[in-house]
Amino acid sequence: MSSFIGWKKNSNSGGTPGASPTSSSPLNSTISNANSVSGLGPLGSISNTSSSSLSSSFQPIQIVNSNNNSPPLSSSSSSTSTYSTPNSSNDTIGKSSSSSVASAAAAGASSTSTYSSSSSLIDTSQFNNNYVGNIFGGQPINPNTEFGSSILNKFSKYLLNKGFNTEGIFKPHPELDNEIQNVKKNLIKDLSIGDMEQASLSTLTQNPLVIGEIMKQYLALLPEPLFSYQLYDSFLLTHSILSPTDRIWAYRFLLLYLPVGFRGAIKSVLGLLSRVHQCSESSKMNSESLAKIFSPVFLRPAEDMYYMKSDQSTLEEIVKLWIEEFDMISKPPTNPNPNSKVTILGTNNTLSQLQQQSNQHSSLPNISSLSSNLIQQQLQQQQQQQQQSHPTIGMSKITSSLSSSSLQVNLQTSPKSPQSPKLLLPTIPKDDQQQMTIVKQKPILSKPTPTTTPTLTPQTTNPPPVPASTLDNNNSNNNNNNNNNNSNNNNNNNNNNNNNNNNNNNITPNGSPLINKRLSIGGFALSPPGASTSFSSLSEQEVEDKVRKIKVSIDTMVSEQALLLIKNLLKSIEKEFNYNHIIKFSSIIRDAKKHMNESSEKQLSLTKANIREFIQEYPKPMSYNLLVSSIPKLDTTNFTEQEKKANDIKRASQVAADEISDYIYYFKLKISTFQLKEQVISTAQIFSKLKSILESPPPSLPTGSSWSDFENNSSNNNININNNINNSSSNNNNNNSSPNSSPLMGRLKTSNGLNSSSNSNVTPPTENQISADKATIRIIEVCSQEIKSRFGSMRSNLERVDINGAFEIGKHSRNVKAVLNDIYVQCKLIPPPDIKALPPGEDQLTTLRKALPPLFDRFVTQIDELTQHVFNNKASPEEITIIVDKLLFINRSLSM
């Protein structure tokens, strides 16, 4: 049987657990399980946290105290370990099991666990301390012995005696490869003909660098990391959420979740690494360099996936902290508060039975040492009907509908049910009024049937009539690209009604009212669609795990990726001046919008009216608003008919993209509340099709081409939309343009002869040349006006946002300041004087509100100077390129 530890705060209402502030969050509720965010695979796939280990990654070893001059390794564990009786609830830790230290963690001071041989997923016959097989064949650590691995113990003793202060002890030494191979062969030979305890490393080599390399190779072949696959998420969340002081206290309890063999190996390896770090002056290896080498030994996910790159720095910080604070972490944990309580659910143990069980395991704290009042409180807590996880790290959760009696019945009647859920990850308590609960195996939840969810016909509302002026404008766009123009302009008409529904409130999903109540839409309920994915070959628990992974994947990864793809498309459209390319880009957004509208309504009975109602009730955060409301109205008097159409298509694309972001935001918040697996699968299919549409190349690209090919062609084609410019310039190659330069500047360079062989002799363009390129004038005028308008909006928003919003504005201001200073340096211009720093206000928010407005004024002055520098014929073509590209970058960064 499996067990896990659930933590909860003490409550003053007779032991009723306090409400967790995140317990009802639709964004966080889905990660309260063993297979949380860190175990996600691609959309719709299962990341099996119990898969086979990666032979290329390191695995932990154990070092024991040497009888010589090695430093003592703190450990409260006993060498005694027993197999539990059928009534015990412990598992050995293997590739798919997790060790239980329920009793140990309950008392808060033990470091020894017992294991049930009947439920172990590891063949314990392999765990022979005198095993003479190939030690480099991936033999697992014995979880039932004090040291876990005898050969690892020998490596540690050897290096603690004569190698911990050797320079570069764990660095690669290619010149020693031959000696390393010879020592390995002789070691395997000695072990095959004798007892492992009798083997001596000193007779094989006197070079500690050789033993250090062999030790690393041994660790690399261990099948599971020292902290186990199951605790991967717990360690990352503990490090990310808790303060440095609380981390050390919490890590002590995480250590209790591992078998005694693993704990001994961890203390052995960390004892050696800590000693090497202490002698970093001679070894030339500190905690940081050691953490980079050994972080995979202690922590790695079961599957090395894309998110591992972002996790790697955190893993190194965790191992670095363990190395530096090893003496502190290795001490037995104690209850941080005398008011901490322990509840054992699902058992009928009396005080005498608890004492007897404690006496059977000498390493566990003596129950009799606890006061009688505390024991009585423990037994009274058994009758509580609901258990909740700690609000800080909600890794486990028990449904409130399950009482302790039902838990007990389930455990007694089906202790080895093949459908029992996997062991959930533990939770770490904060260092304040805490109540620790040891909870038995979570019973199987009843599967909801589609008939229990009524399907209501959503009430759709007719959109308001489209203005006649808009229709006339659309009808005027029927020329060469009639079909494409009509489709895009119709998108503009259909989506104009969304403008009033998009609020630029700086509200993050975590700050939404959805955190405190369940999402619902009046008069609307999701109907269960027919699932195309077959779960017939999966068990009920595997289906639940798969659905949970899909939920978390859509919530945390897929929705953000889709939003980023849309933003990149809008950026490409805004910077594009080729009419045909604009049509192709906008057609992709049009198809994506059509897919979201039709698929959502067909598979989930979601209409645009439902989405609009949801957005009105829960406004989108600023990052999801893709409509640029501050764009000044351009004077289109001198525009050609084709330029007017291109401008209309750009605005229609913005409206369509904003409507897609409405759907993405809706699913991001609602996915965690879907009860039926068919709803989750349909949502995953919708997002999968959306990503394929957004990632597809434009229709005109040949098969096998990519977006990068299209963008390169777009940047190198010198096609001018102005009929007055000579078309012969399109035959020149724009090879000298920077990768970040826009197609506009490519045309400007070509028209000014920058691609000719006499580049160095080219004089700055005359006023007539600059005036002739209307695109250059437009882009500088529009960007400067938009940027200054955004500064005005930031100034007004600064007066009503909270401290977090003010920090965001300050962060964007810092970026703008850096870019503008870069322009002045590259163009060799004299910057305006810096703003005099104001004295700090009463608090941070007041200080920001005083300091940022003068900075906005300075930005406006700098932008005016740069535009005049171009229009007054003082800028060279290179300077124009820099100014235009930087202004585009500032405008885009502020709009996001």
From Swiss-Prot:
GO molecular function, one term: GTPase activator activity
Annotated Low complexity bias: 10-26, 45-57, 65-97, 375-391, 400-427, 448-460, 473-506, 712-743, 751-761
Single Gene Ontology BP annotation: signal transduction
Start and end residues of each Rho-GAP domain: 139-330
Tagged with keyword rRNA-binding: no
GO terms under cellular component: cytoplasm
The protein's name: Rho GTPase-activating protein gacM
Taxonomic lineage from the root: Eukaryota, Amoebozoa, Evosea, Eumycetozoa, Dictyostelia
